[in-house]
A protein has these predicted regions:
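N-terminal secretory signal peptides and thylakoid transit peptides that target proteins
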Residues: 1-16
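Anionic coordination/interaction segments
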Residues: 21-466, 480, 488, 530-534, ...
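Non-catalytic C-terminal accessory modules of carbohydrate-active enzymes
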Residues: 109-168, 172-173, 183, 738-740, ...
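Aromatic-rich carbohydrate-recognition surfaces in CAZymes
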Residues: 135, 460-467, 471-581, 612-615, ...
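Hydrophobic, small-residue-rich alpha-helical packing segments that form membrane-like cores
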Residues: 162-163, 608, 616-617
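Catalytic cores of carbohydrate-active enzymes
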Residues: 207-209, 224, 500-501, 617-729, ...
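Active-site acid/base region of carbohydrate-active enzymes
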Residues: 416-435, 442, 477-480, 484, ...
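Carbohydrate-binding/catalytic loop surfaces
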Residues: 446-458, 501-519, 548-552, 578-607, ...
């Protein structure tokens, strides 16, 4: 059965109708929920589904308390495939892998080498139950760490790096912790502490289960939607084309599983080739045929996936089997038939229901407990499995505490006594962002995908701008990780300086019309410039990167690749009749062509459209680029033309001032301007940051942003004000207040906070708090996502379902409404702007306008502490040198301080451009330390 592209889009998550008119100013009304009664005795920001606590490691954790089997509030409309309607998930991960832990107790592990995938699918109808749980039996009674567990109580804790489940009943307690050890090891540790609460000695068996049937996030399968295929079933059918092979591991203490590819199903291959031919004959508004010039080693799917293993660390296994079908039998995961007997030692299974099952026998006296430890993971090419197993055998009892200690020592921290919950939120965001890293062996770099619906449902890593934004907070703590993300993106640069919109599978450029985007190189130039300024690592510019795309792919220096990107922006993308950078198929907003114009108009729009956003951003980025090159030793002959482009873009943006705000986009002669009658948030902050707006325009603009975009929303500024611009005529359609038709986007509000921070610190701080998980949980406590993680866009108060995100068929944002890295990265980077931080040629400029009596911004690179005594801080870039610290304070505040110290020595005050300047030696591990006191 086939389905037309029009029907597909008409039924997609972007196809929504009807409008909801809400009050102009945000206030509590019958349509806008107040804090629920269940919230009143919980820490701020807990919401309905549990509460925030401080765990035994002095780290934040979320105690999940909802019984999703009985509570109707747990249900979300989803398309079956990845998450169930009542499934709420938590991320555990390290730099190598990421796993999703379910409120049902199971854990799926994502692994990206070869192609992004779950190593252990959850598809109970196919006999696949993910993993990370087990069964305790004394021959009569059974407890399970798969919810509800057959006990009297079942506790669930989402922690930094771990997922804890504690089930009690039948005279026993099982406390299982699944954690990803901090670092780069491709493994999870499962620690199971079993206690005998009865009055008699107990002979017990524990069976640890991890599945081994893959679920690849295949974009090839996603493309087959156009042929009427179910993407999730297509992916699961593809997994059956692999045969499993098992053998004992580590001297018989565990199991090793490998896979053999049997070839593609010929019928499926014909379907895919038909879809490709269809796109070739009849261009689609979103998808295109695959790039015929893609590298030979690129592939939509992983045809040689890694081996997986499960090992008992603290003692040999008492038994094992790979016969998952025989173990679960007709009782399934709730009542496995195999619990009635010892595991049979069968390692001959090859089918999709094969599994890794280990048994441990133990005898416990009354009141006695024992901890069993297992290691589950996958083999990285060129590494030794036995060495990894030995490492964790030695560290089994201490690995969780050691990992937690590492999490406490890394990352960005911010705290203020006036808002205690902020410290928790910042620590949590850093954890989620860092644990979102994986490793891509096509580019040979760590990468932080946007994830969420894009990776887990649609199957692509993109857009190219997104990992660059996610990496920015690590400038302050882990510059080597930033360099990996930069190298990943630099490797994507094509001979003409463009970048693929996204990557699917193993290095395959995403086949999409959005590949003809205009803005991607801007983000790369900006991110590299920020890296060089923050770390002083000018040598990075002369390091070489292996590019992967185009006939002239090969080694090139970072400096030359940036120049290639700049030429692409200025010569290929170029400018239109209004002097603004052209938009092409899209700028940041992927929907402008497909939602606001008809298919018949699209050719003109792509050729003639211009983006105020692109030019406003280019004015900032090109200026930053020129200054960075000058700092790195470039002469004026190279930078003067770039500075001229800065002025050209500023002038073009200034011409788009309406008297109230800046226009959004020129859609060509037929459609004219967007943004004359409505304010679009996208270009406004960049117009301020890039120097396009003068002082009076800035005041007017901030006032209108506050009134039109901020005051109407309790959870962050909306992207587009109400009005005629919300009328969409294209193939994609979204309801007002949703998606790119006025939703709430953290990635946009990050830039707004940055712009506000230099003008109105109180408004900037308020906007930061409104975009927090804590605020969302207070305003919309019964929407589970948005409490500890969230999507890249939330519905605004102007929508029918405020505080939620978009549903729809055949896929919707509600299908995977968490783990979007923008929700974690953007608040972190915005904090650096709230303290007025700017890296300049001579060092650091700080202009804090936060309305807080005291706060602490602490990172390995840079710190700023405000107290009743004054300010102090440090700066420790990679390169040791004499650096300048400029502290700009309001005159009334500055006059209170007379004592200045640099590296422990008192120095006289020196004013430069209205700021106190302090100069001293620092870097390469010895920080420049300074203080300004009364």
């Amino acid at each position: 059965m086939s389905v037309s592209r029009r029907t597909f889009l008409a039924n997609s998550a972007l196809t929504l109708t009807a409008a909801k008119i809400m009050p102009r100013e945000w206030k509590l009304t019958p349509q806008t929920p107040a804090i629920s009664a269940s919230n009143r005795n919980k820490p701020y920001g807990s919401g309905y589904f549990g509460e925030w606590i401080q765990d035994e490691f002095d780290l934040p954790a979320f105690r999940y308390t909802c019984n999703q089997l009985k509570d109707p509030k747990a249900a979300t409309d989803v398309n079956p495939g990845v998450l169930a309607s009542t499934e709420h998930i938590h991320q555990i991960g390290n730099d190598r892998l990421t796993a999703i832990a379910s409120n049902y107790g199971h854990v799926r592990v994502r692994q990206d080498e070869g192609a992004p995938k779950f190593l252990n699918d959850y598809a109970p109808e196919r006999g696949c139950f993910a993993g990370g749980f087990g069964y305790l039996t004394d021959g009569t009674s059974v407890l399970s760490t798969l919810y509800p567990g057959n006990g009297d109580t079942f506790e669930r804790l989402f922690g930094v790096g771990y997922f804890r489940k504690k089930v009690s009943g039948r005279g026993y307690t099982v406390d299982q912790v699944i954690f990803a050890p901090f670092g780069d090891d491709p493994a999870l540790v499962s620690q199971v502490t079993i206690a005998n609460n009865g009055s008699a000695e107990a002979n017990l068996r524990w069976i640890e289960y991890w599945g081994c049937q893959m679920y690849q996030f295949s974009f090839r399968a996603f493309m087959e939607l156009y042929a009427g295929k179910n993407v999730h079933e297509a992916r699961r059918d593809f997994a059956t084309r692999f045969q499993h092979h098992f053998r004992p591991a580590s001297g018989g203490s565990g199991l090793r599983e490998s896979k053999e590819f049997l070839g593609r199903d010929p019928a499926e291959d014909r379907v895919f080739q038909g879809v490709v031919a269809l796109f070739g004959k009849s261009p689609d508004v979103f998808l295109t045929p695959p790039d015929p010039k893609a590298p030979k080693d690129a592939n939509f799917d992983d045809l040689n996936p890694p081996a997986t293993f499960l090992v008992s660390l603290d003692a040999p296994a008492s038994g094992m089997t790979t016969n998952g079908k025989g173990f679960f039998g007709s009782g399934g995961a709730d009542h496995p038939a195999g619990l009635a007997r010892e595991l049979d030692g069968d390692l001959g299974q090859t089918g999709p229901e094969s599994a890794l099952l280990l048994e441990r026998k133990l005898r416990l006296k009354p009141g006695e407990s024992r901890t069993l430890t297992f290691l589950y993971g996958y083999e990285v090419a060129g590494t030794d499995l036995e060495s990894l197993i030995t490492k964790y055998r030695r560290r089994a009892s201490s690995a969780l505490r050691e990992s937690s200690d590492q999490w406490k020592r890394h990352g960005l921290r911010f705290s203020t006594p006036e808002e205690p919950w902020v410290e928790r939120e910042v620590t949590w965001n850093h954890y989620y962002l860092r644990s979102g890293f994986t490793y891509d062996d096509f580019f040979h770099q760590h990468i932080i995908s946007q994830a969420s619906i894009y990776q887990y449902v649609m199957g692509f890593q993109g857009a190219a701008r997104d990992p660059l934004q996610h990496a920015l907070p690590f400038l302050f703590s882990d510059p080597d990780l930033v360099k990996e993300v930069l190298r990943y993106t630099l490797s994507e640069v094509r001979p003409n300086g463009s970048l693929p919109y996204g990557i699917v599978g193993h290095g395959m450029p995403m086949p999409t019309s959005s590949d003809n985007s205009s803005d991607m190189p801007l983000w790369l130039i900006w991110a590299v410039s920020e890296y060089v300024f923050a770390t002083r690592d000018v040598h990075f510019l002369d390091s070489e990167t292996l590019t992967r795309y185009g006939e002239s792919a090969g080694r090139a220096s970072v400096r030359n690749l940036l120049a290639r990107c700049y030429r692409h922006l200025t010569e290929d993308v170029s400018t239109g009749e209004h002097g603004l950078m052209r938009m092409l198929q899209d700028d940041w907003n992927d929907a402008l062509v497909n939602a606001w114009t008809t298919k018949a108009e699209a050719k003109e729009v792509v050729e003639k459209s211009e983006s105020v956003l692109n030019s406003a951003m280019a004015a900032y980025v090109f200026d930053r680029y020129a200054r960075m090159l000058t700092y790195a030793g470039a002469d004026d002959s190279l930078t003067a033309p770039i500075r001229q482009k800065v002025e050209d873009h500023r002038r073009a943006v200034r011409a788009q001032w309406t008297g109230q705000w800046f226009r959004r986009t020129w859609l060509g002669p037929t459609n004219g301007w967007l943004g004359e009658k409505c304010i679009w948030i996208e270009p406004q902050p960049w117009a301020i940051l890039g120097g396009s707006a003068d002082e009076q325009q800035t005041r007017t603009l901030i006032s209108n942003i506050d009134r039109e975009l901020r005051q109407v929303s309790p959870i962050g500024a909306i992207q587009l004000s109400q009005g005629s611009d919300q009328v969409q005529r294209g193939a994609w359609h979204s309801e007002p207040g949703m998606q790119s038709n006025g939703g709430v986007w953290p990635s946009l509000n990050q830039t707004l906070i940055w712009a506000l921070a230099g003008i109105d610190g109180a408004m900037a701080w308020d906007e930061w708090k409104k975009n927090s998980f804590a605020r969302h949980a207070e305003v919309y406590p019964e929407v589970w996502y948005g409490t500890w993680s969230g999507p890249d866009v939330l519905n605004s108060a102007l929508s029918k379902q405020p505080g939620a995100t978009t549903g729809g068929t055949p896929f919707g944002w509600t299908d995977f409404p968490v783990l979007n890295m923008h929700t974690h990265a953007c608040p972190l980077f915005a904090l650096s702007k709230l303290i007025g931080l700017d890296f300049i040629e001579s060092g650091v400029s700080l202009a804090p306008k936060l309305p807080l009596a005291s706060f602490r911004f602490e990172t390995p690179l840079l710190g700023l502490i405000k107290s009743s005594d004054g300010y102090e801080g440090w700066y420790d870039p990679m390169i040791s040198n004499t650096h300048s610290i400029r502290l700009k304070l309001p005159a009334e505040e500055a006059k209170n301080f007379s004592r200045i110290e640099i590296n422990g020595k008192r120095m006289p005050a020196r004013m430069v451009d209205g700021a106190l300047e302090m100069r001293g030696q620092g870097g390469a591990g010895t920080a420049l330390r300074w203080s300004v006191r009364k």
